[in-house]
A protein has these predicted regions:
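Helix-breaking motifs and short loop linkers at transmembrane-helix boundaries and internal kinks
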Residues: 37, 69, 90-96, 124, ...
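Conserved MFS/SLC helix-loop-helix module at the cytosolic interface between two early adjacent transmembrane helices
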Residues: 56-94
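Cytoplasmic helix-loop-helix junction between adjacent transmembrane helices
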Residues: 100-137
Length: 363
């Protein structure tokens, strides 16, 4: 296996674990709603707390990785969110659940910008873009794995055992320690500041990227954290909703792979716009669909376009900033995006609570 494929597998697996943890929450939500008698607004707050932690993690860990190195901080984020999942197994009520998920979110949100910066440090041009999109494609594998756990474990053993399984993934840190290469560029003398980030050269790219990240995360977390719950609200059983979500999740993979292929042939900004338009159209159709076939097709299209757009954005963001502030820039842009991730789940829950309807939420 050549060095690029080896690095892709190592970093991509860490990315997959991050996605698994985010996804598994969406499958827990219908169960904790019943267990603790929550309404939709309260359930939306559960999702929002994880996203708020991810906001803090993205902002903090991106900066720390510029100062202390990508590898160390990446390992630290994995340990943090995996061990907090162990604590989640013993959560006695929803307040404890939300507090623990906030801590989990710090690790989850910190890992992604650090992993992206680690890849971006080693490549340039089209190769960098393709490596970043392919790394992000492991997010789909995380969702698929979470869907399988949800389908085969949660209905029979409950959500706490699912949380325990995610905690075991902390052991992957030993793989990172042994096999992840040391940082491509030394960080010992790096004293990059936010002042550099907001210099005339970097300010406007940061602002525009942050705005796009906000929109993408608002829609992604507002939709996908609620996906199994929305299917239950449509009248499907828990088991059927989990199975349908698994089918929709598989569609993320071709979305990523096509984006990686097209990045070598098209302007990434135009490609991103195309994927975002596809996301909007698929979301509208999904919200208005009233039979299983259309729900599955629209849901698959939504997965295809939304996650493909995410991959393109992952590739575009670090390419616009120099190494010295790359982690800080990536973390800052994603932190603004995480505001959308905080608002999205809560807003969706509130809209459902005031009887706007599923079509209104997805439009």
């Amino acid at each position: 296996m050549d060095k690029s494929k080896r690095l892709l597998l190592i970093v991509g697996t860490a990315w997959m674990i991050d996605a698994l943890d985010v996804a598994i929450l969406s499958f827990m939500m219908p169960l904790i709603k019943t267990e603790w008698t929550l309404n939709e607004t309260q359930l939306g707050l559960v999702g929002a707390m994880t996203s708020f932690g991810m906001l803090i993690g993205a902002l903090l860990c991106g900066k720390l990785s510029d100062r202390f190195g990508r590898k160390k901080i990446l390992m630290g984020t994995l340990i943090l969110f995996s061990l907090s999942n162990l604590a989640l197994v013993f959560a006695p009520n929803v307040n404890w659940f939300m507090a623990i998920r906030f801590i989990t979110g710090i690790g989850l949100g910190g890992e992604l910008p650090v992993a992206a910066a680690l890849i971006a440090d080693r490549y340039t041009g089209t190769k960098r873009s393709q490596m970043l999109v392919l790394s992000d494609s492991f997010w789909a594998y995380g969702w698929i794995l979470a869907s399988l756990i949800a389908f085969f474990v949660i209905p029979h053993f409950g959500w706490r055992i699912a949380a325990l399984l995610t905690a075991v993934l902390a052991l992957y840190v030993f793989v990172l320690r042994k096999h992840l290469p040391d940082d491509a560029i030394t960080h010992k003398q790096n004293t990059a500041s936010f002042r550099q980030l907001f210099s005339p050269k970097h300010k406007w790219p940061l602002i525009m990227l942050s705005l796009v990240w906000f929109i993408v995360m608002l829609t992604y977390y507002g939709i996908f954290l609620w996906l199994p719950s929305v299917l239950v609200l449509r009248g499907f059983s828990i088991v059927h909703s989990l199975g349908y979500t698994l089918a929709m999740s598989i569609a993320q993979l071709p979305g990523y792979y096509l984006a990686a292929h097209l990045l070598a042939k098209m302007n990434p900004k135009k490609l991103l716009i195309g994927y975002l338009m596809g996301t909007i159209l698929a979301s509208l159709i999904f919200g208005l669909a009233n039979n299983v076939t259309i729900i599955l097709i629209a849901g698959a299209a939504l997965s295809f376009f939304d996650l493909g757009a995410w991959g393109i954005l992952i590739a575009l963001t670090p390419s616009l900033f120099p190494h010295a502030i790359r982690g800080t820039a990536m973390g800052s842009a994603q932190a603004v995006g995480r505001l959308g991730a905080v608002i999205g789940p809560f807003l969706a829950g509130w809209l459902l609570d005031i009887k706007v309807g599923i079509g209104g939420v997805f439009s």
